[in-house]
Amino acid sequence: AGPNYRGHVEGMARRRGAEPQYPARPEPNFRSVHALIGTEEKIIVPRECSGAVQPEGQLAVVIGKKARNVSKDNALDYVFGYSIGNDISQRVWQGNDRTMFRGKNCDTFKPFGPWVVTDVDPTQFRIIVRHNGTVWEDFSSADQIWDTATWIQELSRYTTLHPGDVLWMGTEGADGDMVPGDVIEVEISDIGTLRNYVVAEE
């Protein structure tokens, strides 16, 4: 998911010194499977980075069956379950690339896990991001601009969703910078905690 919380739109606008511009419709973008890592693994900051690497705690929605042109009313029938994602972002590269590909898809920039839970309400998750034990963000999936069902409906109009596809549902804030030595945790109620360690590329 592109911008999906008003707080994130506003925080990123402040970073640019601009007025917030709220999207008129869901704006999907792509994340590389090669950037995925699991819990307790290392987030490797590339040598070329000069700071501005930030976490984004996100609800992750795992598709369970093939979905094409589905309605919002039955969209959640295509969900297998829910997990945790951390959409690591290098803000300078992100801002210089209209596709956001470089700033979002570096190796190890997509921590995911540790569990997938089923039979829960995706609109009622509490999402907490911690930096070295200090809470950076604390928000609810109820505050999404567009909910999970809307995203599945919209995406399935243009492309077939397949079992194992994962939708990352956006974040609320614009967090501070991470540096090597930091520990980043994303906790989502009823799912668990995704924990990763920030290191520099050797």
Language model feature labels by segment:
Residues A1-E48:
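Extended, compositionally biased flexible segments
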Residues E19-Y22, P28, A35-I37, S50-P55, ...:
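Solvent-exposed alpha-helices and their adjacent loops that cap or buttress functional pockets
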Residues G11, F30, T39, P46, ...:
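Short beta-strand-to-turn element immediately C-terminal to the catalytic PLP-Schiff-base lysine
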Residues P26-P28, H34-A35, K42, Q58-A60, ...:
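Structural motif
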Residues G38-A75, F80, G85-I88:
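Non-heme Fe(II) oxygenase catalytic core, chiefly the N-lobe of the double-stranded beta-helix
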Residues N4, H8-E10, R91-E202:
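Catalytic-pocket segment enriched in acidic/His residues
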Residues E10-M12, T39-K42, E48, V70-A75, ...:
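A short secondary-structure junction signal
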Residues N29, A60-K65, W151-Q153, G164:
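Short, conserved beta-strand element in jelly-roll/cupin
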